[in-house]
């Protein structure tokens, strides 16, 4: 079961009040959405985005199983948060008092998704959140040039062995098309020295992360989302972003600084908010989470 991170901190900074409207750009298992709905009762609404239709269906069930009018106060959108403005306009949703995105990867998707998000299960190399996306991971692995593969593994995965891994991929695919997570895992293992394969972070983690980011254009979506979020926010509205790796955090930090320079608002978190030891004990993945919050002028 996916456990949402930094829920208390998110609620503290978004400060939902009765009747206010919010956007949860990454619905997942609806953990943050439910926390907001508890605070903006009785008639505040949440617009809840998820590009993954399976995740959105799970969220609908979770919200629907709760007592009260939560389901009728939630608008579910099967789309990327990058298309925030389009969807808020089409649904005449507003005024918007706060927006949240949690850029972490849902642990529910690491289960038997059948889409190859995890190297712990042997599944087809797909990694698409949405089937409307026409770039599965196998396309990158089997058809992109070596330099292109090396670039995404190095930049998106921050993997020091990116060159060796990309060389191994290109060498292996000449013999056999790489179609499953297990096949890719074996190729990565062949490229990394044995002595480095028992580190705290699994040796395939960075490569799989890089592929997932590339397949779903995660950094591009974030860069499109941020200005749209500030645009649709009401004056005094708050934008909260939870990131899990340095690439995302850098984009958010720099964007917030640019907004301050342009006198569009102020940063409420001088330093990113991180999880306390108690939360990390219950949910180890929260160790990597960083929350930054911006308030529109």
Language model segments and positions:
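S-adenosyl-L-methionine-dependent methyltransferase catalytic core, i.e., the SAM/SAH-binding region
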Residues: 1-297
């Amino acid at each position: 079961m996916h456990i949402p991170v930094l829920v208390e901190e998110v609620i503290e900074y978004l400060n939902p009040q009765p009747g206010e409207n919010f956007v949860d750009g990454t619905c997942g298992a609806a953990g943050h959405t439910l926390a907001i709905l508890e605070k903006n009762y009785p008639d505040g609404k949440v617009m809840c985005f998820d590009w993954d239709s399976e995740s959105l269906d799970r969220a609908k069930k979770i919200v629907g199983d709760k007592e009260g009018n939560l389901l009728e106060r939630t608008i579910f959108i099967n789309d990327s948060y990058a298309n925030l403005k389009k969807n808020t306009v089409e649904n005449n949703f507003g005024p918007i008092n706060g927006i949240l995105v949690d850029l972490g990867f849902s642990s529910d998707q690491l289960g038997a998704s059948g889409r190859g998000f995890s190297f712990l299960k042997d599944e087809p190399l797909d990694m698409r959140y949405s089937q409307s996306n026409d770039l599965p991971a196998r396309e990158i692995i089997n058809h992109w040039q070596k330099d292109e593969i090396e670039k995404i593994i190095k930049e998106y995965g921050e993997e020091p062995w990116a060159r060796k891994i990309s060389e191994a991929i290109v060498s292996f695919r000449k013999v056999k098309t790489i179609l499953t997570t297990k096949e890719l895992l074996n190729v990565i293992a062949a490229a990394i020295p044995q002595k480095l394969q028992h580190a705290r972070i699994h040796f395939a983690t960075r490569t799989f992360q890089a592929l997932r980011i590339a397949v779903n254009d995660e950094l591009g979506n974030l860069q499109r989302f941020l200005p749209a979020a500030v645009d649709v926010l009401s004056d005094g509205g708050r934008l909260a972003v939870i990131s899990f790796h340095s690439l995302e955090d850098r984009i958010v930090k720099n964007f917030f600084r640019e907004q301050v320079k342009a006198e569009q608002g102020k940063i409420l978190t001088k330093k990113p908010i991180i999880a306390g030891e108690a939360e990390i004990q219950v949910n180890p993945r929260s160790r990597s989470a960083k929350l930054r919050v911006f308030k529109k002028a």
